[in-house]
Amino acid sequence: MKVLKFGGTSVGSAQRMKEVAKLITDGERKIVVLSAMSGTTNTLVEISDYLYKKNPEGANEIINKLESKYRQHIDELFATPEYKQKGLELIKSHFDYIRSYTKDLFTLFEEKVVLAQGELISTAMMNYYLQECGVKSVLLPALEYMRTDKNAEPDPVYIKAVSYTHLRAHETAANLV
């Protein structure tokens, strides 16, 4: 089974996501790994900086701008009302989650959670797009199988075991995103 990784520029717009979808839907089973859409991680770092400086108003302003950008991507990516709605609900959920960190203490742990949202959003968007196109795909959120050890290094034994379980559970899917 192939593992294909696409960086932020490759999935930086709705059109680019559609092009990636064409590349990965060749009928061969594969795992697809996506970065956050171009510019997203930098913006999430900016949001985190505002939160470290205890400036929730500044953070919320940037969050709102990024959410608006994603709403536009949803509108451009999906053709059907059903998937546009799913996409909008996805965006709302993630951005509400990011906003929840503007109300409380912000530490390195919270920063890592905020920074992970870009990849989580792009992979979920791609999975919905593939489903809308009739491609059998399954979303495997990295947070379900990634774990670090006491030194904050990846725990390869755990990751391998849980990843294998996920792969076996979804043997009939053409693409695992």
Residue ranges and their predicted role:
Residues 1-177:
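Nucleotide/pyrophosphate-binding catalytic subdomain
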